[in-house]
Amino acid sequence: MPASDELRSFLARMLGWSDERAVDLALRSLSLALDHRAALVLCGEGDLVPIAWALHRHTLGADRPFIVCDPRRGTKAASVRSPASRASGVAAFEAAIGGSLCVRSRRLPGDFSALVARLRDTDDVLCAICNAEIADPRPPLVLPAPLVVPPLAQRSAELDRIIAEYANDAIEELAAPASGFTPGDHAWVRAHAAASLADIEKATLRLVAIRTSRNLSGAAARLGMAVVSLSRWLGRRKLPPTMLSDHGSHR
């Protein structure tokens, strides 16, 4: 497991800085999951797969496979926006060896029983279960405790800190100057892209890439995505005014 201070900091961002007990329980649950003694259970509103993916990167590392078992999405390669997926449980298990396998409790595969049997017999795959139902908030009597991700609507006092930390991550990842994310960008993310942690992470990274690249093609290349995809993302949003003046032509 990575340095506890780094992981604790990320979990506090995800669960809330004011809830130290939730962070302590999450660290224990992650330890059990990484030792393959239990599945990691995430509970909360919305799509929790991006959070499971982020936890995977912070624990096992981005170079290890992260596979979503999703009969609806089918077999897809990983992209900058989405992790790789497989339609069947067994196929997902085989692709996830050495890494993590993620399943949504409401989209279990037809061969789920076979998947469970495989997981019980291996120490090579970490299993993460995303459950839309909010778990009982009382302290559990047994471990592992689920990681209950509170909605951002309940964390308005922490929203600015969340945005700032994701912006710092983006600046570090892209080796950008601190000026790559401005107070205007921060206000824009707060107003237009703060529905979820995943939205904030995506928006801060893309804004930093756009602001610190010569053109849209350069930003897309640094993000590892197609320029047409980044252009569509921009087309659905009104950018911060200062960015429009600095990047009047995104070609």
Kindly give the residue locations of the regions a language model identified.
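Walker A/P-loop
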Residues: 35-70
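Short acidic, S/G/P-rich loop/turn micro-motifs used as interaction or catalytic elements
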Residues: 46-49, 72-76, 106-111, 133-135, ...
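Short Lys/Arg-enriched helix C-cap and helix-to-coil transition segments
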Residues: 241-251
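Nucleotide-binding/hydrolysis machinery
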Residues: 1, 6-17, 21, 28, ...
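Structural recognition of the conserved hydrophobic beta-strand(s) that form the central parallel beta-sheet
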Residues: 42-43, 100-105, 124-133
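Phosphate-binding P-loop
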Residues: 7, 30-37
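Conserved alpha-helical scaffold flanking the Walker A/P-loop in AAA+ ATPase domains
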Residues: 27-33, 77-119, 168
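Key DNA-contacting residues within the recognition helix of helix-turn-helix
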Residues: 231-232
